[in-house]
């Protein structure tokens, strides 16, 4: 896609941008981007087990996140829902100062901007344009269509320059019914066939999703199974990471553990956190159990023996093992390289 087709835009002509985008994105005369490699290892991307949200207007909480940065994979400095309307500019100034002057250790540093439709995004991007090399990416809320990513991409290029803009990773928040429906198009978005997608992860925002759909939250969270599974399936199919919802009962450690392990079992690669008390439990839950690791090791070892003997399926501890199970075992062992196994037995 010729980038000259699109003019750098501002909020006032967003509708024109949407129309131009649709003409090009859905045109049969334009070659669509080639399919993602479905076998792509999600660990080619940074670990994002703990995705820690911090209000950008709260200096005390920013300092706390910095102090805990060795236990956090991604620190998200929020200008959106975590900041009151009359504190937005204060948050921008505080974030700008903090990312330049403070050390966040090895943690990935992200800024959560306001949504495309909020009327506040442009001021956020103006701030980011002054610090593009100090952050790793941006969290984009309320992504419902690929043109939301398109608009932000062009805005960043205008304000930050092509090179700095291209180096910023995107994390798209799934917060509504239409967002879930449009996940395939959102995941497939890139500025052109020769431009790698900046999208790295999908983030499920359960409370916003419930507010949009009218779903009533229950302790079991079964009402969210479809949406959570959709996020994971689309993310994995496109080589992206999937970040699970916030556990709002942040003082209930057992509820957090249960919800986090459910996310692990569904295939999520990390979980959002809003309180320091959640960090240790989330980190621990994303480590495979010692029991699972030992079983996976045994499968791989036995498979090598049976393959050398020209045998296919085999049995371990009364369970039939075939190639899908061998692939599962190898994936568990690859995860163990990054997440040392935990001592207790596998949670049910």
Regions found by a protein language model. Give the residues of each.
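Expand to "…catalyze enediolate/carbanion chemistry for C-C bond making/breaking, isomerization
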Residues: 2-348
């Amino acid at each position: 896609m010729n980038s000259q087709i699109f003019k750098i835009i501002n909020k006032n002509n967003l509708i024109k941008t949407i129309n131009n985008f649709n003409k090009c994105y859905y045109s049969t005369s334009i070659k669509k981007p080639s399919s993602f490699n479905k076998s792509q290892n999600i660990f080619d991307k940074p670990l994002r087990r703990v995705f820690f949200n911090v209000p950008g207007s709260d200096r005390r909480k920013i300092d706390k996140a910095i102090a805990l940065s060795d236990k956090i994979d991604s620190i998200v400095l929020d200008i959106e829902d975590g900041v009151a309307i009359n504190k937005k500019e204060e948050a921008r100034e505080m974030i700008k100062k903090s990312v330049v002057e403070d050390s966040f250790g090895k943690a990935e540093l992200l800024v959560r901007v306001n949504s495309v439709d909020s009327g506040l995004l442009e001021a956020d991007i103006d701030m980011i344009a002054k610090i593009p090399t100090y952050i790793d990416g941006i969290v984009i809320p309320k992504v419902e269509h690929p043109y939301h990513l398109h608009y932000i991409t062009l805005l960043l290029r205008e304000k930050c320059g092509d090179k700095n803009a291209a180096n910023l990773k995107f994390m798209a928040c799934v917060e509504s019914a239409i967002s879930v429906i449009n996940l395939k198009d959102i995941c497939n978005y890139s500025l052109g066939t020769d431009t790698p997608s900046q999208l790295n992860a999908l983030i499920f925002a359960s409370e916003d999703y419930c507010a949009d759909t009218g779903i009533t939250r229950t302790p079991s969270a079964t009402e969210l199974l479809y949406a959570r599974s959709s996020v994971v399936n689309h993310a994995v199919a496109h080589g992206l990471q999937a970040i699970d919802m916030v556990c709002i009962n942040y003082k209930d450690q057992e509820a957090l553990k249960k919800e986090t392990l459910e996310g692990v079992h569904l295939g999520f690669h990390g979980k959002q956190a809003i309180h320091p008390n959640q960090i240790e439990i989330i980190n621990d839950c994303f480590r495979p159990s010692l029991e699972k690791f030992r079983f996976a090791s045994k499968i791989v070892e036995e498979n090598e023996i049976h393959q050398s003997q020209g045998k296919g399926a085999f049995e371990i501890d009364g369970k039939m093992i075939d190639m899908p199970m061998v692939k599962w075992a190898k994936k568990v062992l690859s995860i163990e390289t990054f997440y040392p196994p935990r001592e207790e037995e596998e949670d049910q």
